[in-house]
Structures are given as C-alpha cells and as structure tokens.
C-alpha cells in the first residue's frame, strides 16, 4: 500500500498579465517616385505594467510588482531606391533596392542589470512579380545582421535571411459589369 500527503497553497492574482501600450510615429520622404527615405520611432510602455512575482527572499506570496520591466524605445531608418517603380522599364530598373538600420533599448532586466541593447543593419531587394493583371506584387529577399550586447552579459551576433511576398492586388477595385 502506498500513501501520500500534500499541502498545497493556492494564490491567485486578478489582471496578472497585461500588454504594454505602444505608440509610434514615422516620417517618409519620397523623391520623384524613385528615392524613399523613412524614419520611425516606437515606444512600448513596459515600465508601467505590474508583473506577478514571488519574493523568495522574504517568503512573500505572489503579488503584482512594478519596476520589473522598463520602457522600450526603437529607432528605425530606412532607404529604398527603384528607378522605374511603375512602367515598362527593364527588369533591373523595376527592382526595389532597400537598406536600413535600427537601434532598440531592452524592456527587461537580467539580475537587476538592463538587458541587451540591439543594433541591426539590413539590405535587400524586392523583385517584381508581373502577370497580365498585376504589376505591383513582389518577392522580397533581405539579409539582416543583428548585434545584441549588454554590460557583463553575453554578446550575440546573428545573421538573418528574410524571404517574403507582398501582394499589392486591387482588393477593393470597382469592376464594371456589362
């Protein structure tokens, strides 16, 4: 025969998990439908969120505590060039060439120290996909180098390859029926 006993304490916290408020603004300059330069700023308000934590040091039960996270800022700068975005130019003149950089602050702490800041550089191109009724969709290919680092923490370098499709169809086009 086997017997067992257990002592279980249950703690519950209402509204324990929340998502941060996110605000952003951006500007883009378009020169002659060939050159585009854009800047974007995003702020995520992680610092105002409570997070359920257990204080093992003082043997306190689970409670919502502030100051676990920090507000996160991200700055992006991007550039695009396309010689002939719309038209019947040669294939290479219709390709969209892109490059960008970004910088982001962390939203979390590791052992009381700010987490890693992130810097990235990317470059890529958009290959036009054309058929009889659509000339605006693209196959997008890019490479991105990302460096994450923080004081007294691991430093990380990574390279990402991104492949995606952009379908710029006329979804709400008014068709004439005869």
Q: Over which residues does each language-model region extend?
A:
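Outer-membrane beta-barrel porins/channels
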Residues: 1-178
